[in-house]
């Protein structure tokens, strides 16, 4: 029996046979063509088919994966981009070679040009470029991109895995994931959580493990190769206990969000598209604490029309009924790009023109979304929330735009309700002026994912920093405490969302800080509810 220690990206236990997944880029034979026009048509038709495949993959996966499935839309956007298309067609025309070979050489040239850049956003873009190139080559060469896991459930071991590879695996055959590269905050790791699949990272994987028996312990980050009978028996018992615990959690679906001493601390859901609505209701969330509205802007060739936005928000409002739905205005930019937005390349897009900054630059887009939200407010209980606020001057601009939107609706006799507004506190600047910001809105919501990385000055998806990245850092927790105190000083509700809100190791600490609500992905509602119901805040003034 061999034992390997890594990092558990998602807890759980898997026992079974290993399938080692070999990643290889498609290599195509070069041959000369005589009819350039026909070859260009072959390429363009394949490009159209791949874009349709990516759209289908998004629609099939968004119900379970939510915002993680948006990677298919980002890949579709890259494929729609004229620069990539022109580069490939230029090779076909100038070198008179087959289209599959032209795609391969264009891919290789791009990867060679940017291979030494460590900027995570660029690396993700290159990964997407590699994947869509391989899809194109596969389509042109008649090769299926689907990863065959065989007939029986397996533990997939590989050097690294991308979200698209993970989503294309048969979920019924996938028991666990073990990789050498990656971080517990990567898109693939977060996706494993939503799929309830145990995942281990930073394991020195070996292709010779293929076909051997293994145990994955996501709790301790341990991998056992060829486990002995005693260890296997122990883990069979633990796996059964895991199953029973999940069944117990399901009994909490209709239980109230109250502490042992009767304090009500509501648990809301974070969702990234309309298909997540079913899981919000299934797990008994108090409402939607964060609706990421970017899904309406990605994977398309132009801005969504106001009426399209309105109909989506109206459906959400009607579905949720009296339950609150907080719509965050479009947080575009950074890793959420679309060709039609024409956002210039930035050295550091995470720190660049994104969120409210981009909305204030694109006022026509911003007003269309605001009008749609106000119109939909007549059909339910909606609230507005602004992302990436860092100054009162931004709030001045927003308030003027809101005033103009309301005047326009009034002039046309379009009904709307009073909408509560809130701010995402996700920058240190916003933390330091959180009391001033609280006076401008009805509630505050702590976006802990961005707040943590900006506070620590570390990219949370950079694998080189994984061991140093600590979102439990005292500085992060003190900032959260500061915002809660600032909000309460102005009689404003303060909610925590993001990965930290779902961390049950912090649930009691957040409650003792005085947080009013938590907002988590639907799959985490029940574990957080269980943790919350075990806390006793008796005698704690902040919990009152």
Regions found by a protein language model. Give the residues of each.
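Conserved, well-structured core domains of diverse proteins
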Residues: 1-141
């Amino acid at each position: 029996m061999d034992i390997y220690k890594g990092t558990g990206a998602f807890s759980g236990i898997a026992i079974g046979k290993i399938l080692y997944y070999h990643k290889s880029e498609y290599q195509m034979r070069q041959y000369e063509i005589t009819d350039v026009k026909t070859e260009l048509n072959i390429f363009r038709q394949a490009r159209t088919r791949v874009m349709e495949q990516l759209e289908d993959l998004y629609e099939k996966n968004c119900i379970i994966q939510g915002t993680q499935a948006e990677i298919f839309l980002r890949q579709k956007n890259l494929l729609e981009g004229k620069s990539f298309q022109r580069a490939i067609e230029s090779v076909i025309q100038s070198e008179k070679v087959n289209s599959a070979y032209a795609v391969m050489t264009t891919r290789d040239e791009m990867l060679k040009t940017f291979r030494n850049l460590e900027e995570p956003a660029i690396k993700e873009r290159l990964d997407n470029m590699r994947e869509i190139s391989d899809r194109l080559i596969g389509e042109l060469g008649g090769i299926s991109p689907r990863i065959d896991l065989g007939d029986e459930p397996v533990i997939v071991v590989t050097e690294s895995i991308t979200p698209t590879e993970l989503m294309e695996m048969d979920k019924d055959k996938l028991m666990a994931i073990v990789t050498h590269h990656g971080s517990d905050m990567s898109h693939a790791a977060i996706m494993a959580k939503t799929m309830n699949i145990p995942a281990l990272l930073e394991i020195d994987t070996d292709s010779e493990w293929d076909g051997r028996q293994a145990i994955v312990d996501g709790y301790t980050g341990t991998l056992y190769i060829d486990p002995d009978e005693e260890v296997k028996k122990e883990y069979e018992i633990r796996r059964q206990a895991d199953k029973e615990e999940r069944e117990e959690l399901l009994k909490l679906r209709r239980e109230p969000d109250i502490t042992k001493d009767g304090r009500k601390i509501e648990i809301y859901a974070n969702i990234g598209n309309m298909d997540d609505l079913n899981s919000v209701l299934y797990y008994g969330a108090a409402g939607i604490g964060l609706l990421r509205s970017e899904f309406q802007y990605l994977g398309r060739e132009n801005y969504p029309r106001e009426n399209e936005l309105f109909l989506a928000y109206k459906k959400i409002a009607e579905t949720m009924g009296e339950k609150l739905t907080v719509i965050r205005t479009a947080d575009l930019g950074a890793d959420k790009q679309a060709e039609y937005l024409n956002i210039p390349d930035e050295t550091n897009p995470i720190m660049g023109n994104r969120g409210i900054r981009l909305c204030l630059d694109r006022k026509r887009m911003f007003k269309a979304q605001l009008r749609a939200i106000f119109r939909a407010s007549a059909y339910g209980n909606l609230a507005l929330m602004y992302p990436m606020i860092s100054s009162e001057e931004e709030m001045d601009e927003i308030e003027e735009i809101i005033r103009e939107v309301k005047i326009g609706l009034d002039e046309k006799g379009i009904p709307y309700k009073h909408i509560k507004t809130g701010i995402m506190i996700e920058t240190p600047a916003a933390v330091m002026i959180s009391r001033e910001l609280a006076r401008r809105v009805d509630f505050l919501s702590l976006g802990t994912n961005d707040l943590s990385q900006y506070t620590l000055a570390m990219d949370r998806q950079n694998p080189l920093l994984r061991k140093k990245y600590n979102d439990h850092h005292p500085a992060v927790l003190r900032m959260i405490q500061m915002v809660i105190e600032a909000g309460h000083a102005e009689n404003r509700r303060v909610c925590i969302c993001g990965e930290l809100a779902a961390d049950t190791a912090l649930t009691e600490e957040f409650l003792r800080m005085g947080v009013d609500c938590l907002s988590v992905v639907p799959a985490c509602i029940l574990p957080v509810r269980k943790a919350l119901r075990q806390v006793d805040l008796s005698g704690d003034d902040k919990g009152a």
